[in-house]
Swiss-Prot record:
Belongs to the UPF0253 family. Disulfide bonds: none annotated. This is UPF0253 protein VF_0662. Transmembrane segments: none annotated. The lineage of its organism: Bacteria, Pseudomonadati, Pseudomonadota, Gammaproteobacteria, Vibrionales. HAMAP family: UPF0253 (MF_01064). Coiled coil: none annotated. It comes from Aliivibrio fischeri (strain ATCC 700601 / ES114) (Vibrio fischeri). InterPro entries: UPF0253. It comes from the Bacteria. It holds the Pfam family UPF0253.
Length: 68
């Protein structure tokens, strides 16, 4: 997926991180998994959103990518 395929909010933050106005997190995969886990665990959110977050987190955990 490319940044231009993402929503406006993602593109905005991408631009801010790239310009140095927003902090960059070197362990991006860990950050993503933690965020997706938080979404999946939040019972106040719709079930479909929680299931999608859980599926994405599980796939990241199984993938070959690893923060070092």
């Amino acid at each position: 997926m490319k940044v231009y395929d993402c929503c406006d909010k993602v593109r905005e933050l991408y631009s801010l991180i790239g310009s140095g106005d927003q902090g960059y997190i070197p362990q991006a995969i860990t950050c993503a998994v933690k965020t997706l886990n938080d979404i999946a665990a939040d019972e106040a959110l719709p079930k479909e959103a929680r299931e999608r977050a859980a599926f994405a987190a599980a796939n990241l955990l199984i993938s070959d990518f690893e923060d070092k």
